[in-house]
Amino acid sequence: MASVPSVGIFYAPVFVSSDRIIDSIAPMLNRWTVDGKADFAISVPDPLKVEIRHNNGFTYAVESNRVSIAYQHRVKFRNISGGRPVAELISSPLPFSGLLDAAIDDIIELTLLLPIAKSSSINRVGIVSSTHADEDDMPPGVRKLIDFLAKPWPGALSAYQVSIVGNLPSSKEYEDRCIYGITKPDDDSDIPNYKFDWQRGYVTSFPINKDTLQKEFQRNRKAAIEYFEKLAIGDEFDVLG
C-alpha cells in the first residue's frame, strides 16, 4: 500500500505572530535554500499561522496550539520539444517508514526552534497513516469494516464517508485513541481513501526538550505502527460477523 504519514504535536496555546515564527525557524529555511533558490514556499493563512510547503512533499504548519507535518506527493509539468508537457515527480518517493522517520526528525527540530519551546508543554501527539486504494486492494481489516457497514443494503455501497473515534487501551500516563476516516466518492474522480489518526493524550503534559521529544516519539512511533498493522490484519473485526 502506498501510505503516506502525517505527524502532529499539540501544546498549551501560545500566541505568537507569524513574523516571529518565520524568524525562529530561519535555520531550517536557510538549509532549504540552495544557490540562492528556496526549495519551499511560505504562506500565512492568518496572522498566527504559518505554512511551509517544501518541494520534497512535506507541508509544515505552525499554529497557536499545534505543529504538524504532512506528506503528499508533488509533481510538476515539464515541457518537451514537439509534444505535450509531461508530469514529473519532484517529491521524495520513500516508503511509509522512511517518510515517517523524516517527518518525526523534522517536527522535533521545528518544535525546538519555535518560541513555544520555552513557554509551553505538550499534551498530545498524533501519527497518521493515509492511503488511497481501490476496494479490492484494501487491507483485510478495512475490507471487513466496510463489508459490515454495507450489510443493511443488498448491493455494494456506491459511496460512503465514515468517521469513527475509538478509544484504545490506556494507562495512568496517557489515553490513546484512533480516529478512523474512510471515504469513497460518488463518482470516478478519485479512489477510496482510508485514514488512521492515532493519538496519545498525556494525563500530565511534559516540557518541550529534545531528549523528551525523541523518547516520546520513539515509543509512540512503535505503538502507532503496531496498531496500524493490527488494523490492516483486522482480527478484532471478526466479532462483527
Where are the predicted features?
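Short acidic, glycine/tyrosine-flanked loop/strand segments centered on an H-E-D-like triad
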Residues: V67-S92, D190-I208
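Aromatic- and glycine-enriched beta-alpha-beta binding-site module
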Residues: P85-V128
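A short acidic-to-branched-hydrophobic micro-motif
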Residues: V7-P13, N123-S130
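Aromatic/basic-lined ligand-recognition segments
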Residues: V125-G201
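Long, compositionally biased interface segments
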Residues: D187-G241
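N-terminal low-complexity, intrinsically disordered segments
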Residues: M1-G83
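Hydrophobic, Leu/Ile/Phe/Ala-enriched alpha-helical segments that form helix-helix packing faces
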Residues: M28-K37, A103-K118, L149-W153, N220-D235
